[in-house]
């Protein structure tokens, strides 16, 4: 099957929805951040501390390209589809869905998470600024937008229906 890439801000529900969706569709779900941690042999905070965000983004690009060829459901990291290159790869390879969740909801989920170095080391205002900057990029790199206000099972069902009628020639 062609991949389904889930994108959106940190804490929008990509990983949760991805697991449910993969189960419904009988395929694998890859959490891109988890894959990078497993491949690098260290946590994302350790990668950031040791090599910096730029190196992490390079690993993210490599992982995204690998899963573009494999398929399944890919829960991207919050910054994975910000680059033009990654956005094009994802749109060309599969179906991209932006889970559009209110900032306050995302913030409530991520504000104290030490495994999210950007969130953990940023103020609420800095994260809101990042959210506002990223949202138009998620929109530009997505085929579909689904409200993150629904329960995860509903979001997964909506994505499954979209996938069944998606025209893969439109990437």
Please report, for each region that a protein language model flagged, where it lies by residue.
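P-loop (Walker A) phosphate-binding loop of NTP-binding proteins
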Residues: 9
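Short glycine-rich anion-binding loops that position phosphate/pyrophosphate groups of nucleotides
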Residues: 78-81, 102-104, 151
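A glycine- and Lys/Arg-enriched "phosphate-lid" helix/loop adjacent to the NTP-binding pocket
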Residues: 92-136
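ATP-dependent small-molecule kinase phosphotransfer cores
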Residues: 32-80, 84-88, 116, 124, ...
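Conserved glycine(s) of the Walker
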Residues: 13
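Hydrophobic anchor at the beta1->P-loop junction of P-loop NTPases
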Residues: 6
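NTP-dependent small-molecule kinase module
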Residues: 16, 20, 24, 135-171
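Short, well-ordered alpha-helix to beta-strand connector turns
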Residues: 70-71, 93-94, 141-142
